[in-house]
Amino acid sequence: MSYIVELLTAALCLVLLIASLSLQRYKEKLSLFTGICLFIILIVSLFSEALLNGSQSQSLFGGAYINDSFSTFFKQLFLIAAVLTVLISRDHLVSKQGEFYALIVSALLGMMIMVSSGELIAIYIGLELMTISFCVLIAYKGDDKSKEASLKYLILSAMSSAIFLYGLSLIYGITQTTAIKEIAEALVTGQIAPLEILGMIFLIAGFAFKIAIVPFHMWAPDIYEGAPTSITVFLAVASKTAGLAVLLRLFMTGMSSASSYWIDLIIVLSVITLVLGNLVAIPQTNIKRLLAYSSISQAGYFLLGIIANSSLGIASILLYSLFYLFANMGAFGVVIAVSKATGNDQIKDYAYLAKRSPFLAAVMLISLLSLAGIPPLAGFIGKFYLFLSIIEKGQIWLAFLSIGMSVISVYYYLKVVKVMYFGESPTKLESIPVSISTKLALTISMTVLVILGIYPSQVVNVVLSVSKAFLS
């Protein structure tokens, strides 16, 4: 029963769809039901055979679907993100509809399929399931902004899927297979043709959209601003890490022997993503757009682990993914609470937040400083291992550039902190109410960022063992 996590997730999706149609009176209870079910699935995943047995992996359909410690780690990451998303969504008007939660679980299932796929067609199926679910979720508010954001996401997603499929067809045309393991064998034994290199470039471009890597980032600011904020954070965290997981499996195992052909492209993408993401974030006055460009710059840091092309590089991506999840959940959770109270997402609306809600201000402070990589918070540990991995690779200049961009990011993060603690006091100081479910999600996020920043050794050991098992 090593695939029980996926089966339970699919069953939950069906139950939610049926319940939303037949149990109209209990629609508002579905958020609690969904949260509890997702938490139970997370507990089941924590005790799953693949993670407990370290390097042991199992496969279905001739290796098309793989369950190993690598995929299990990311599934747990997605489940945590889904649980926290449900918690912070409970007070939203859009969350009163049962299908809202069915779509979240549907997107979650698509991500699980993506990270466990050992075959390009299976990856595409998971990718489309996730994308279609997000297209509907982004438009869920029903206003003009969310509809526009959904349409943009739909059109650009279709383009990225077409690019991915074209790359897939080129790889298949040369290697006569879509199985990642067989592609790896074909690349090792044969001479790499120009069309294969072109296919690799198209595959990278297809997933660069999902991760919001420059120049495939154009959708992120508008969609982050227009979508319901709880969906924005789920998209920013889970969708990004799902794309990263696929890139890792595809290029670190399937195409590692051809790394000399694609690694320079990844370096270029990382540099322009780091520079543009951080510089364009500086003048932003809308908090969601600022966090969108912050998310774009974070994608550049993630690419450092792929550039390292080593066990430490993979481990650093796993580690940073975990910390990135909680930092974004904390920041966007505060955005939801403040936006609900003020009706705006402007940074100026956070004036004197420390007086209006000390709890929200503290969560935002810790989340932003963690994203900036300030010790002793968890984000510092994640960035430390990312920088260490590329230094071991000999890319000293890239490490210094990344550190410099981190210093720049401190400026625009502290701009928000300054407004919260020292901004011009509004004429009327009104306290901002925070629901129990939102407070629980924010407390979990803040606690994890602090504790794992001070005591990271246990988590570091886990990701190192997962990365070694993945490469073996």
Swiss-Prot record:
Its main location: membrane. It catalyses: a quinone + NADH + 5 H(+)(in) = a quinol + NAD(+) + 4 H(+)(out). InterPro entries: NADH-Q_OxRdtase_suN/2 (IPR010096), NADH_UbQ_OxRdtase (IPR003918), ND/Mrp_TM (IPR001750). It is an enzyme of class 7 (translocase). The keyword Cytoplasm does not apply. GO terms for molecular function: NADH dehydrogenase (ubiquinone) activity; NADH:ubiquinone reductase (non-electrogenic) activity; quinone binding. GO terms for biological process: ATP synthesis coupled electron transport. NDH-1 is composed of 14 different subunits. Subunits NuoA, H, J, K, L, M, N constitute the membrane sector of the complex. Belongs to the complex I subunit 2 family. NDH-1 shuttles electrons from NADH, via FMN and iron-sulfur (Fe-S) centers, to quinones in the respiratory chain. The immediate electron acceptor for the enzyme in this species is believed to be a menaquinone. Couples the redox reaction to proton translocation (for every two electrons transferred, four hydrogen ions are translocated across the cytoplasmic membrane), and thus conserves the redox energy in a proton gradient. This is NADH-quinone oxidoreductase subunit N. It comes from Clostridium beijerinckii (strain ATCC 51743 / NCIMB 8052) (Clostridium acetobutylicum).
